[in-house]
Amino acid sequence: MAGNTFGQLFTVTTFGESHGAGLGCIIDGCPPGLELSEADIQFDLDRRKPGTSRHVTQRREADQVEILSGVFEGKTTGTPIALLIRNTDQRSKDYGNIATSFRPGHADYTYWHKYGTRDYRGGGRSSARETAARVAAGAVAKKWLKEKFGTEITAYVTQVGEKEIRFEGCEHISQNPFFAANHSQIAELENYMDSVRKSLDSVGAKLHIEAANVPVGLGEPVFDRLDAEIAYAMMGINAVKGVEIGAGFDSVTQRGSEHGDELTPQGFLSNHSGGILGGISTGQDIRVNIAIKPTSSIATPRRSIDINGNPIELATHGRHDPCVGLRSAPIAEAMLALVLIDHALRHRAQNADVQVNTPDITLSNK
């Protein structure tokens, strides 16, 4: 079965390829009455778009979104919302040398074996360019979540290659090309990325994603646990190779007396769970880390094969990110938002009338 649709009640189906006429998505299940304009969506697309600094791909795309349906007189109608982003700066000639060969680390080999054909221009459907449609859909989800619950979703880069980035404040994220919550290390990171590009190589990255003001109760045990759905969503982002929620892999070295978040009438005393217990949100901040592999498109020659199985040496030419993780923060935010809105609607559908006498202790800290 095709895997182009995400979600159950708030569904997003994306379409398009890297070098096609355009790409976009169909959102179905968005509640009616949400004030929505193209400007609401454009803000996050501008954060993700290419060509914004020398440290990312120099492909120049405006990524201007068009709302084709589902919005009338400035508000959502409850009918499918169609969003379109046209491609304007394709340079397909850069990919002629891979029409009959497979780039190491890319989906070329697997797409060829699965479908028997592939759009080799910029990776086609497997390109990270497809994530522009996810960011557009995520912007809609983020706006609804903020208006409904006050939910705020923030992502930032915590490591680039071997360079760990100290947290100095979220106010710095929008002020540098690295989506870093840091000011003092930016010059160091600039020099580091310049050296990576000059070496004709690439590096990976680590990101932290956090959602504040998430209501208690989201998640559908046992198979659609909130943490399971978040991990699924994050692993669906191009180049993501690892996901941690809460303490993550550090949980291995913790004792139970440390890891278990104690409760008091004034709130939880820690958040090693990452805001999720038993697959259900606790009302605390949801905390996620993701690891992103080095960009596979590099100009350094590497061994591969052609479609006939013959050995070749291949160097990838064109415009590529030396660290694809640098533009991943808006994508990760979008995917977390899509999970949360879907589960908020699912929770409302089944449990809207549930009432308990126990107070929501997370509210005392807000």
Swiss-Prot record:
The record's disulfide annotation reads none
The UniProt keywords, alphabetically, are: Amino-acid biosynthesis, Aromatic amino acid biosynthesis, FAD, Flavoprotein, FMN, Lyase, NADP
The note on the cofactor says: Reduced FMN (FMNH(2)).
Give the source lineage, highest ranks first.
Bacteria, Pseudomonadati, Pseudomonadota, Betaproteobacteria, Neisseriales
State the reactions this protein catalyses.
5-O-(1-carboxyvinyl)-3-phosphoshikimate = chorismate + phosphate
Q: What SUPFAM superfamilies is this protein classified in?
A: Chorismate synthase, AroC (SSF103263)
Q: What cofactor is needed?
A: FMNH2
List positions binding FMN.
125-127, 238-239, 278, 293-297, 319
* Its biological purpose: This reaction introduces a second double bond into the aromatic ring system.
Q: Name one GO cellular component term.
A: cytosol
Q: Which domain of life is it from?
A: Bacteria
This chain belongs to which protein, by name? Chorismate synthase
**Class in the EC hierarchy, top level:** lyase
Q: Which Enzyme Commission number(s) are listed?
A: 4.2.3.5
Task: Copy the pathway line from the protein's UniProt record.
Answer: Metabolic intermediate biosynthesis; chorismate biosynthesis; chorismate from D-erythrose 4-phosphate and phosphoenolpyruvate: step 7/7
The portions of this protein that span the membrane are none
Does the UniProt entry include the keyword Transmembrane helix?
no
Question: For NADP(+), which residues are the binding ones?
Answer: 48, 54
Note the subunit structure: Homotetramer.
> NCBIfam families of this UniProt entry?
aroC, PRK05382.1
